[in-house]
Structures are given as C-alpha cells and as structure tokens.
Amino acid sequence: MKEVNDYFVPWLKGEKMYLSSHIELAWENKSLHRLMSNENPLPPSRKVLDAISRYGKIANRYPEQGKDVRKKIAVINKLDGMGNVLIGNGSSEVFDMIWRSFLQPGDEVIQHTPCFGIYKLRCKALGGKLVSVPMIYRDNQLLFDADGIIKAISPKTKIIVVANPNNPTGNFMDGKDFVKIAETGLPFVVDEAYVEYAGLAKSQVALVNKYKNVMITRTLSKAYGLAGMRFGYMLANEQVIAQIAAMLIPWNVGTIAMWAALAALEDVKALEERVKFNNEAITYYENELKDVPGLVVFHSYGNYILLDGHGAGKKGDDMIAFALKRGLILRPQEPIYGNDGFFRLTIGSKKENQMAVKAIKDFFKS
C-alpha cells in the first residue's frame, strides 16, 4: 500500500518551506536593528493608518476585486485602464501567478545573478529549471549582460526575468537592452520593486503598449513602506492580464491591504518624503565609506547597498558577525565570481545608519 509521501509531485519531495532566518531573528530579538530585508525604516503615513483603521471595521466582509486601486495604478502609469493591472498579495504572489501561467515541469526561466531569490523559489516549486546568467564584474562595477541572457535562450525557455534596478546590485539596465530582450517574443518580466526611488521616468512601463510579452511587476513594500500589508501588482497587455488572472485565488488581496495601498498611492507627499530620506541616506553611506581602503561601495538606486571587502582581505560573513555583536543585522551575500567579500545593508533610521557606518569602519580597521 502506498503512503501519502508517494503522491507528492517528484520535484517537491524533500524540499523545505522557505524561511527568512534573518527576519525570524529580528522578530525574536526586537532590540536588534533591521538593516537586512530592504524594509522602509519609516512607518506608514497618517493617511494610510487612517485607511487601515477605517476598513478594519468591515474586515468581516469579503473584498471586491480592487477596482479603485487598479484604476489609480493605471492612471499613475499612463495605461488605458484597470484591465492593464493585476493585483496580488505582495509581488511574490504576482511572480507565482506568472510562473504558474507559463511553466510546465522541465521548462526554463532565465535570470541574472546575483538577484532576488523568489524567482528561483517559485521556479523550483513548479518543477522548472532556473538558468542563471552572471552579471559582468569589471572595474568595480557589476554590469548587466543582455547578450548573455539572449545567448542562454533554449527551446525550453518560457520566461526571462530582470530586476530593474537589480537587487542586490542597485543598478539599472540600459533601455536598449530591454528592447533587445522584448524582441525575442518570450514572456519578459521586469521587476521594478524599487523603481520609485529613482522615479517612474526610469520605468520600462512604456514597453507594455508595444510588446504584448512584457510584464512589469511592482510592490508597495519598499518606497511606500507597506511590507507587512502584502500588496503588489503587475502591468501588462489587457489580454495577458486576463489570462494570468485566471490563476488568481479568489479574494487574494484583503480589504484592508487594498485600501491601505490606495491611500499610499494617493499620498504623494508621503512618498516624496520617504524617497528623499532614502536617497540622502544612500549619499551619506557613499560619502562616509568611499575612503575605506579596499572596500567597494556599489552605487544603489534602491534602499540597500551592496559592498565588497575582498580588496581588503575581508569576508562578508565576518562583517555580518561583527555587526551582529553591535546589534545590527546586515545581509550576507553568497560568494560570486569566487569572491567571498560581498555583503549588503538596508537603509535604516538616521541613528541606525550612523551605527552601521561606524561598525563597517571599525571592522575594516581591525
């Protein structure tokens, strides 16, 4: 007689639930400073908190399909209407819906590396194969390689995904390279989780009107500071949206989350304040750390900074351990290019940023 384990799909057997150990650590030790998960250090605006309070009172009712917030998103992005917008329980769910819509077991997803880990997780959960194209590390810069992505295409390729700006490197890919990839006709996902920090002029959303295969994903977890509310969205051709929407779990976005999202999108002043705070902090880090011998600080258009201490003979993991002793959680980075000197930090409060700068300087003096 078979056991229940015999019925699991083969690519799921032995796999474990994704666990963000650094987030678990932060919740278990609330005195630690969270400079590791690209969260916004500023709390939601008063208008958002008012919306949460107001709509929390009708949390006993099922939500509708987010018509108001989808219309607002379409207006912001100069698209025809809410038919060009799909909303999800964070952009992680949006990726899951896209992957489910295009992938069968054995199909391939092409990504750049280093990059956001969710692409691999959702690909693996569906029995797909991830094909990684390394960025080019040259002259202390990590550069996109669009030609490398195109060369990696095979008959099994079903999705190409590029984060713009990239996480964790913080840089943008050239516009002409997006066109080059879009011209392949393959489903092309552009992850713009952090684009608000540089402004929507850097978005590739205009490609949606020209290329039916281009899909833009965004989140309100970063510049808008709603990571705990779980709200993300996709922008694409209306027919593509309609087909992917068939994968939606009914009522996938709760009432409180969608109205909090709408309040955040309408509160332009609050967004501007958060972007200004973040970008000034990026400049602060760059100015403070530029003269640390052997340390490479990659310029970032996000709310995080990638650093490389290899030139000083320092290991990223040792920096993480050193910072933790001072109450700071920074983010480790797996070795790339045979280099174990990389680590990453998230922009924090003014005090936290000062603490992080001091910790980094002290570590590199040791």
Annotate each PLM feature.
Residues 322-326, 335-366:
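PLP-dependent enzyme catalytic core of the Aspartate aminotransferase-like
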Residues 279, 292-326, 343, 347:
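Conserved PLP-binding catalytic core of the aspartate aminotransferase-like
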